[in-house]
């Protein structure tokens, strides 16, 4: 039997407040997948947790042919993180601090940047959170900004994916935080993604929560639809929903499309428009450019197919993917200024080829200009 102690005399019980920092111990129990159960509770005489910084509850670089290391579009990620922190009352992280922190994390771990011949990347995970003791629903007095890195393969690999439209779960409320890169937008979908995988679907897709008639985004990636006319004209359509992340990879693909002379539209996409697309791709920092083989509506099992079972990548997805990969790895001229090089060049000079384009004048139709940036940015270094 544990002895119960009397109230401590070290506290003025009449003056105690919710902000009083006492440094009390806590109890921990850990669930291990290997055992399938929670451990017995243990009292830890310390208020601090020892948790890996890449634990999902808290939450790229590439090597060039010349041996240099470059970070892909860190300035855009800095702006996206600034947007996201502002939505949840975290103090703004200056862009100069963000960029310096990312560079320091990459250069200090530069031996883990994969060789330029590899399809792997160094994934960069910046994140911020309130770190001081606080029970009440008020802003904490202290915040942490961290940058972690880890070499990873492409998130979904190179194969085309079958996607399932979730009808029993809403990713984001109409006036909620769907446009921000915050943890609450990701943790709830894990249950549904796992169920979809068990049913044979590699990805899940969300409709808007208000009408259930418009495409928002995939759970892990942005959505792009590609239309090809009988005359061969190509059009890329991106959703303009106010409830989705401002995808850096989607923005890259739209800029590449304009560079090719393709038409680009950013507008609402009705679910009923899905059969009109020649290809659909999922785009994201970790996912890169992934072709979608089919899209199935969860409740009715109505299915739209884009690729046969033996095809892993559509023609236009391959063009976008190849161009993006070549720019990231500095195999071609970086005409967009996306690659931010860091550190010293260790080896010989290797020429890069010029990037192909089109003489056709590109058209950009920005039907709805309400675009939303994400937070807690993730990205790659090449």
UniProtKB/Swiss-Prot annotation:
Transferase: present as a keyword of the record?
yes
List, separated by semicolons, the cofactors it needs. Answer: pyridoxal 5'-phosphate
Keyword field contains Transferase: yes
Q: Name one GO biological process term.
A: branched-chain amino acid metabolic process
Q: Name one GO molecular function term.
A: branched-chain-amino-acid transaminase activity
How far does the signal peptide extend, from start to end residue?
A: none
UniProt keyword terms in alphabetical order: Aminotransferase, Pyridoxal phosphate, Transferase, Virulence
> What is its pathway?
Mycotoxin biosynthesis
**Residues annotated for pyridoxal 5'-phosphate binding in this entry:** 80, 217
Cite the EC number: 2.6.1.-
Modification sites for N6-(pyridoxal phosphate)lysine: 181
| InterPro entries assigned | Aminotrans_IV, Aminotransferase-like, B_amino_transII, BCAT-like_C, BCAT-like_N
Homology family: Belongs to the class-IV pyridoxal-phosphate-dependent aminotransferase family.
What job does this protein perform? Aminotransferase; part of the gene cluster that mediates the biosynthesis of gramillins A and B, bicyclic lipopeptides that induce cell death in maize leaves but not in wheat leaves. The nonribosomal peptide synthetase GRA1 incorporates respectively a glutamic adic (Glu), a leucine (Leu), a serine (Ser), a hydroxyglutamine (HOGln), a 2-amino decanoic acid, and 2 cysteins (CysB and CysA). The biosynthesis of 2-amino decanoic acid incorporated in gramillins could be initiated by a fatty acid synthase composed of the alpha and beta subunits FGSG_00036 and FGSG_11656.
Name the record gives this protein: Aminotransferase FGSG_00049
